[in-house]
Swiss-Prot record:
Complexes and interactors: Interacts with FtsN and FtsW.
Enzyme class, first EC level, given as a word: hydrolase
Species assigned in the record: Caulobacter vibrioides (strain NA1000 / CB15N)
Record's protein name: Probable peptidoglycan D,D-transpeptidase FtsI
Domain notes: The active site is important for FtsI localization.
Length: 589
């Protein structure tokens, strides 16, 4: 072993200087005693000195090797220290962008029983650590037991104090979890406790593989999200929240074929580096842990079920000229058309009357079974342990069938809505959502819940609802050239204070997909924007419905993320969308 390895500083290290000093003192002690000693005593003293010298050398080399191993990380500036309690591996996005990382830091301790010169040690620490209160240093240096002095020292700060060569001053290496992007994707990434245990998000869901990665097993945990998509989603969601001041808001982007979550936002958000200082409301992952009555976005499922069961076609008609009386209740349309509507028009005008009539044709048993097949009666299948259980009807009577057909009487999470919408848009196959990146080209095996024909028809119907000038409720989400489709949703919230639904308290959303053209197997994405109790303003003419507050934000998200996802605008669609007859329609439910 070379002398350069005897701890930081090699032969110039404090440890090596200490060994040399001890040998020098022994040598001078020998010189002082030899004059008065008898010859045989002189020989014994020399033997003792030689043995002592080699003993000191052995101790020095051993300690130097140990100290070198202990503090090698500071010199190397990388890697994970084996055996560090709570150590975790890196977390990255689908493109390798760093999302979470362990950074080494050190805690400084003083053991007064091992201090050689208390006054010198106290003075040196006072100069090196001016931020530490004097009383704490006094207690640590002049006390009677080992005491903590300061934590959070960087490797450079630790080395500077170590090189002072102060016996009794020691360090303990610890890991601090850092999130380089701060609040970006905080709800999806999650956070850990002081011991390095995952408490939320991917940190909790993937706790075991992330811990194993710290030991070099399996590499970093790679999530499905794209930070470029995530940043655009969060930015537009924040703008919508600032404009319409809701209680909370949710944004989602998924790949409909793979179930990969490319972006997930919950507002208000928090900085994952300061999770302990965030409020419960900020830490709440509304995309996974909150459930809502989704309102008219459910009409997409009801229409698809009607087509799939064969009780209706796109040309089937429904008389919406008068309110529909069903048992003891009367169903109205928000924007009464007072017309006979075909199925596409029922969807475009978001007709409660037409949708309830369709659900009655389907029947309660079949409707509830389809909802179950679409995953709407169970928590969304995803790694996140926050995934909430829905609130579902106890019985499927005539009133329940009508209510659930247009999104009332069932509370589900936004993730559950996305999972079901994926099946609606990918050719009819149910697949779980995932927060982990899948290998390129891999599409998990799915369970068929709708026919390919039904899925293809729904893509056309959802596109018709967004095409400008066609009278659909989603026109404000259109992006020329990207073939956007979607469905607005405005669900009134039940108010216990008045024991009925309160039209002043709404959950407003827009469920979008793009591109709707091309074959069923073509790449396709789902986008959701949801605002909980938004407030209308002058820009929305006082309306707080999904078509006014959520659809525009969804369109802006799609326009920004399409280039990242490789979706190119098509010139012929730009021409159609910009034709003179296509004035923007009134956005509705």
């Amino acid at each position: 072993m070379s002398l350069s390895n005897l701890g930081p500083g090699g032969v110039h290290s404090p440890l090596w200087r200490w060994v040399v000093e001890r040998v020098w003192r022994l040598e001078h002690a020998f010189e002082r005693s030899r004059a008065a000693a008898r010859p045989e005593d002189d020989t014994r003293i020399r033997i003792f000195l030689v043995m002592g010298f080699f003993g000191f050398c052995f101790v020095g080399v051993s300690l130097g090797a140990g100290w070198s191993a202990l503090f090698s990380r500071a010199g190397q500036g990388g890697g994970y220290a084996q055996g560090v309690e709570g150590a975790r591996g890196d977390v990255v996005d689908r493109n390798g962008k760093l999302l979470a990382v362990d950074l080494a830091h050190y805690a400084l301790y003083v053991d007064p029983r091992e201090v050689w010169d208390a006054k010198e040690t106290r003075a040196a620490l006072g100069r090196a650590l001016p931020q530490v209160p004097a009383k704490r240093l006094d207690k640590a240096v002049f006390g009677d037991h080992r005491a903590f002095v300061l934590g959070g020292l960087t490797p450079d700060e630790k080395d500077a104090i170590f090189n002072l060569g102060l016996p009794g001053v020691t360090f303990e290496e610890q890991e601090r979890r850092m999130y380089p992007l701060g609040p970006t994707a905080a709800h999806l990434i999650g956070f850990v406790d002081s011991g390095g245990k995952g408490l939320a998000g991917a940190e909790r869901a993937l706790d075991d593989p992330i811990r194993k990665a710290a030991g070099g097993e399996g590499g970093p945990a790679q999530l499905s999200i794209d930070v470029r998509v995530q940043a655009a989603l969060e930015d537009e969601l924040r703008k919508a929240a600032e404009e319409f001041t809701p209680k909370g808001a949710v944004g989602l982007v998924t790949n409909v074929h793979t179930g990969e979550i490319l972006g997930m936002a919950s507002w208000p958000d928090y900085d994952a580096n300061k999770a302990g200082g965030a409020t419960d409301d900020q830490r709440l992952n509304r995309a996974a842990a909150s459930v809502y009555e989704m309102g008219s976005t459910f009409k997409a499922f009801t229409v698809a079920i009607g087509l799939d069961t064969g009780v209706a076609t796109a040309a089937s008609t429904f008389d919406a000229r008068e309110p529909y009386k069903l048992g003891y209740r009367t169903i109205h349309d928000y924007h009464a058309t007072k017309a006979v509507l075909n199925l596409v028009e029922v969807f475009q005008h978001s007709s409660n009357i037409g949708t309830a009539m369709l659900a009655e044709r389907v029947g309660g048993q079949r409707l509830s079974q389809y909802f179950t097949n679409l995953g709407l009666t169970k928590p969304a299948k995803v790694e996140l342990q926050e995934s909430a259980r829905p609130l579902t009807p106890r019985k499927w009577d005539q009133d329940t069938v009508a209510s659930t057909s247009f999104g009332h009487g069932m509370n589900i999470s936004p993730l559950a809505l996305a999972q079901a919408m994926n099946a609606l848009l990918n050719g009819g196959e149910m697949r779980p959502l995932t927060i982990r990146k899948l290998p390129p080209g891999v599409r998990p095996e799915g369970r068929r819940v709708l026919s390919e024909h039904t899925s293809a028809e729904m893509l056309k119907i959802m596109r018709a609802n967004v095409v400008p000038g066609e009278g659909g409720s989603g026109g404000k989400a259109d992006v020329p050239g990207l073939s956007v489709g979607g469905k607005t949703g405005t669900g009134e919230k039940y108010d216990p204070a008045i024991r009925r639904y309160n039209h002043q308290r709404q959950v407003s959303s827009f469920a979008a997909t793009f591109p709707t053209d091309g074959p069923l197997e073509a790449d396709r994405y789902f986008v959701l924007i949801l605002l909980d109790e938004p407030k209308g303003n002058a820009n929305s003419f006082g309306f707080s419905t999904g078509g006014w507050v959520a659809a525009p934000a969804a369109g802006r998200v799609i326009e920004r993320i399409a280039p990242f996802l490789g979706v190119k605008r098509k010139t012929e669609l730009v021409t159609i969308a910009n034709s003179p007859k296509n004035a923007a329609p009134e956005a509705g439910l």
